[in-house]
Amino acid sequence: MHKIYPLIKSTNFPYIERNSLKTIQVNLGYKCNQRCVHCHVNAGPNRKEMMNKKTIDNVIDFCVNNEIQAVDLTGGAPEINKHFKYIIQKLFKKNIHIINRCNLTILEEEGMDELLDFFPKYKVELIASLPCYSQSNVDAQRGKGVFDKSIRILKKLNNKGYGESKSLLLNLVYN
């Protein structure tokens, strides 16, 4: 900002100052159970790049040492990372708020249904992506049946208290 400021000073552009870092977003990997045509990281089932445990430990240390208040987990589908529960458990013990960006259908994949009980236990805030409110549009972008699966999972999350209590936050993003 310091080098560019003289160039924008005459434009009445407001000076930007940064405050302390409070939230970081961490991409746990590019592997995903979906192949969304609009995915900005080109995630998909064939991607192999996943964050390893050593890097996750470095992220946790960074958060503790820099008084980070929230960690926003993303991917691909972050739940696919084999250290997904580990990072949540460690951050929770350090009293760091956890946000998980979820495509919803991952929670119907084999072995993932246990996350429906895991998320509330660790007060994970969920940001669920749904590219549209119509079945035809969602299925066109994400594949046939994705809309119905997403609605099924949303109902299950509601039954676990998400969207029903202030302590279990569920946000839908229209992307």
What spans do the regions from the language model cover?
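Core AdoMet radical
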Residues: T23, A43-M51, I68-N81, F92-G111, ...
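Conserved alpha-helical substructure of the radical SAM core
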Residues: H2-G75, E79-H97, C102
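Short helix-terminating capping/connector loops at secondary-structure junctions
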Residues: N19, N66, Y162-L169
